[in-house]
Amino acid sequence: MEACLDRENVYLGMPVGISELVLSGTTLFGDVYFYEDIAARAAREIGVRASLSHGVIELFEGPSRHSIKELTRFNESLREDSLVRGLIGVHSLYSVTIGSIKRASVHSMGRGLRIHMHFAESLDEIRLLRERYGRTPVENADEIGLLRTRPLLARAVYVSDREVEVLARYRPYIFYCPFTIMSWGSGIATMLSYIDKGIPVILGTDSPLTAGWINILFEAKVTYAAQGSKYSKPTQFDPYRMLSDSIKVGGGSSGLGWGWCY
């Protein structure tokens, strides 16, 4: 489906997705994909805030999708925009070269923009990174200096207790997208271990392509059920705190204020 996307598809679909976000109370969203100039246009026309980036994907079969240079130019075009701000969207440690991630980290520190990436989301990723680099995602991110940028890490399901301690030193932002990741057969992230260590956790919807909808209130309901199951205690997780943090902490992480949804 991704290979079939073109500019017209994106422009027709973005207002629908943004409208669904607004209906569930979201006034600021993040998106890392293709044709993000179209996403920016749609956000301006509707009047919501957005934090956007082209998605850099290099290590897969087919032509690469965008580059760090393209991403930099896109971010520069948004510097004076009152509604739309740039992100640095490198897809993942398994689909982008180490060199590009290091360049993205330099750009992040120099421009004050967050890196966004998928992180520790599947057992296949863990296996691939061990085979390629001899390290887990957390070990790899620490080794190359990625964690110093305090990136936005989507999912972060397969992280050991020892690695949570490593993350706690840097306090990256964790995007928790429960419905999508569980529907793929991946595990349930131990969100309380992050929260207890002071690592900011933000609710996300992932996308209409993978989740089927983008309703942050639905994701809060799934989070409550999933975390209750994970810890075998239905009152273990506070959904009100999760929503509150998603608004306050999430909005601040983007540099555009309150009202975040990924």
Regions found by a protein language model. Give the residues of each.
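Divalent metal-coordination and catalytic microenvironments
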Residues: 25, 43, 88, 118, ...
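A structural motif
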Residues: 24-26, 48, 112, 171-172
